[in-house]
Amino acid sequence: MANTPVNYQLTRTANAIPEIFVGGTFAEIKQNLIEWLNGQNEFLDYDFEGSRLNVLCDLLAYNTLYIQQFGNAAVYESFMRTANLRSSVVQAAQDNGYLPTSKSAAQTEIMLTCTDALNRNYITIPRGTRFLAYAKDTSVNPYNFVSREDVIAIRDKNNQYFPRLKLAQGRIVRTEIIYDKLTPIIIYDKNIDRNQVKLYVDGAEWINWTRKSMVHAGSTSTIYYMRETIDGNTEFYFGEGEISVNASEGALTANYIGGLKPTQNSTIVIEYISTNGADANGAVGFSYADTLTNITVININENPNDDPDFVGADGGGDPEDIERIRELGTIKRETQQRCVTATDYDTFVSERFGSIIQAVQTFTDSTKPGYAFIAAKPKSGLYLTTVQREDIKNYLKDYNLAPITPSIISPNYLFIKTNLKVTYALNKLQESEQWLEGQIIDKIDRYYTEDVEIFNSSFAKSKMLTYVDDADHSVIGSSATIQMVREVQNFYKTPEAGIKYNNQIKDRSMESNTFSFNSGRKVVNPDTGLEEDVLYDVRIVSTDRDSKGIGKVIIGPFASGDVTENENIQPYTGNDFNKLANSDGRDKYYVIGEINYPADVIYWNIAKINLTSEKFEVQTIELYSDPTDDVIFTRDGSLIVFENDLRPQYLTIDLEPISQ
């Protein structure tokens, strides 16, 4: 009984195999091995260091270390959550039905003004017509752009043509091969844009089915698939259906799902765009760089829609990074190739349009059943183009449920107007003040990109200032005052739900920017002797709250007689608001709505004072308010953004040099 193991478990003896695999280095493993050998009778008092057996111990230790490292790496690289190599994460994601994004071409739409020497009724601008454009803030090394499709333009009465072309950055590459079912089809070009691929089999175009469900493909469907190889190249492959003829009916059949396989020795042509990716974002200054017979390009309009937020070519992107693949690859499997939940919509949009979408959130509205509202912010600018919206909507049609209609909308943007004061040591600044200001703006932009420009995220003034302090070693300290800004598209009347900041604001702090009012009166211009309309600036402001937390929304100042008064329309006589200083004695303010401070809701309707929208020469106004806290929160599809290129008025920087 004395030798019976406790609880009938084996106990370690002197000659038992040691736990030498616990060691993580060569020295530890070798030491554990020697200690184990010293415990055996054959090697008692044996000098391992001075013997030839030391070489064998080295060999065993190295072998154990290699096995340990390879085994550890193999286990880690087998799972998406623990893999370190991008190739391992990519292969695991593709097993879940997620194709990682390749480089994507920057795109834009332009309108040409052309003439034709033959004066034909219409002309055709073929796919692949070349143009050149320069990236933002550069005038060297222009980027190639090509038209994505054939465009037909009809001659107008002035014998001119105005084709609108969709351009993609890069060059069209055409590869032709003879199909061999034993040889993989691989494109060895890491600059390929997988969304701009066309594949032809014996002259007939086949359809890319990579992101679609195999359930919807028949055995004779002419489709193909793509996947990323271990070394980052792109492989094309087909289904396993082999064509045959039904002897009784004479119909073409196949005996396998997933699509048809080309016949042996078929001619396969692959056309794709090889692009520079994100480097070409913001490209402007387009010029015609091709030669079309009898066609002359007179002018190129880079912004045919007159978009005030035009940013040039955008949508260019680099290959998807490993962490994004790791996250979306797992979620994509849960979607089961259909859009049902809000997360499903977010995942599909992020997967396919990740190169142009920075943030996306899907939500529903109980008052509008049957719609899935998808708020998306592009990486460049603030608003998606009409073409981009339609592309997203059309892409989702294959995955959303029939009773649900996806609606692509812009987020409810909240801007933070920042008045920044930065103190720096004059003797430590090695560059100019202009350079330092640029560094500060870059740091603020980085803070917004990393922490703020995410739905349901928050802005903290203190955290932004830590980024500013890290802009350069010469910065001693910084301080800032902030205001929240809503851009109101319809200044005349607020939506039925009102305007919200989703944060508490201070009394009488809500003020709009000034905008022009046409009084309808005429005055003679002494310089020209001609009559002109009398115009002056007014603005919308709020008053202090009353005992119930309700304040008034008023507009002014108007000149006497410019607003027709009656028993329901009378000037506001209180002094609990910030008046707009003016030099012509205007002092008439009128109530047009109210502000509920505790509930954070603002309403107004200028029609209450019998003025029409034509009286105001403005479309969009900026509505400023002071928050009660330095931490700003968002919810319900609202998004805090920083776009200094498009909205420079929301940032002022005061640099104060100090000699030390």
Curated annotation (Swiss-Prot):
Record's note on what induces expression: Expressed in the late phase of the viral replicative cycle.
Pfam family, one: Gp6_2nd
Subcellular location, record wording: Virion
Keywords: Viral baseplate protein, Viral release from host cell, Viral tail assembly, Viral tail protein, Virion
Example GO molecular function: identical protein binding
Organism domain of life: Viruses
Entry keyword Nucleotide-binding: no
Entry GO terms, CC: virus tail, baseplate
Family per similarity comment: Belongs to the T4likevirus baseplate wedge protein gp6 family.
Job of this protein: Baseplate protein that is located next to the tail tube (inner baseplate). Involved in the tail assembly. The gp25-(gp6)2-gp7 module is involved in sheath contraction.
Subunit field text: Homodimer; each gp6 molecule in the ring interacts with its two neighbors, forming an N-terminal dimer with one and a C-terminal dimer with the other. Heterotrimer with gp7; gp6 is part of a (gp6)2-gp7 heterotrimeric molecule. The (gp6)2-gp7 heterotrimeric molecule further interacts with gp25 and gp53; the gp25-(gp6)2-gp7 module is involved in sheath contraction.
Protein name listed in UniProt: Baseplate wedge protein gp6
